Amino acid sequence: MEAIKKKMQAMKLEKDNAVDRAETAEQQSREAALRAEKAEEEVRSLQKKIQQIENELDQVQEQLSQANSKLEEKDKALQAAEAEVAAHNRRIQLLEEDLERSEERLKIATQKLEEASQAADESERMRKMLEHRSITDEERMDGLEGQLKEARTMAEDADRKYDEVARKLAMVEADLERAEERAETGETKIVELEEELRVVGNNLKSLEVSEEKALQKEETYEMQIRQMTNRLQEAEARAEFAERSVQKLQKEVDRLEDELVQEKEKYKAISDELDQTFSELTGY
């Protein structure tokens, strides 16, 4: 009987120890479950951050693509402006060459006019000299009359030549007026072209400034992309670490649950043994 009591006390003590171990295992299991939930929550938070970073990265890449498109458009506009400037330069060169030819024709016409005027003055001088000379000798008179006729003929020829020269001079003056009008038109066009060149130059400067800003923005975007990539890599590393931690905690939870099941089985076995012992004692 004393042995049975000792055995019952030992079994009760073992039962109490098993209950304590079971409670401890349950507490550890709950704590492990809380740690696992916390780790899972951190993983979800990291996944959200990763998704947010990926969205920001997509936005930055889209902005970079738009900036590159705008930069290409500005390059095309710059090339078109340069082509327009080259066309204006060619037009100015043609106008300058036309003006030089007109000035050369005017110079030649002026020289011819001076030569014709000198010839007409010389003929008129000879005619007046022959008309006013007093000659008493008949032969000399006849000779002089012949010379006079010849001089008149020469004068008439000179008049005809003068008329021809005058007609040509009028044509030259008309050509000169047209050349001057063309020169004035050319000067006006040159002024307009210079103004256009100034506007184009300002546009080129603006494009250069815009290009510099675009390059600066591109560098900023690239730096942001590098930063986002680093942040994404760090977040992925943290996520991998958190996943490994969750796996470890899950293994710990599984182990504690297995121990809990074992302790419950031991507790059940002890309870069954106690019940059997009580039944035996009662029957005894």
Swiss-Prot record:
Transmembrane segments: none annotated. Belongs to the tropomyosin family. Residues 1-284 form a coiled coil. The molecule is in a coiled coil structure that is formed by 2 polypeptide chains. The sequence exhibits a prominent seven-residues periodicity. Tropomyosin, in association with the troponin complex, plays a central role in the calcium dependent regulation of muscle contraction. This is Tropomyosin. Residues 1-38 are annotated as: Disordered. InterPro entries: Tropomyosin (IPR000533). It comes from the Eukaryota. It holds the Pfam family Tropomyosin. Residues 12-38 have a biased composition (Basic and acidic residues). It comes from Rhipicephalus microplus (Cattle tick). Keywords: Coiled coil, Repeat. The keyword Repeat applies. Homodimer.
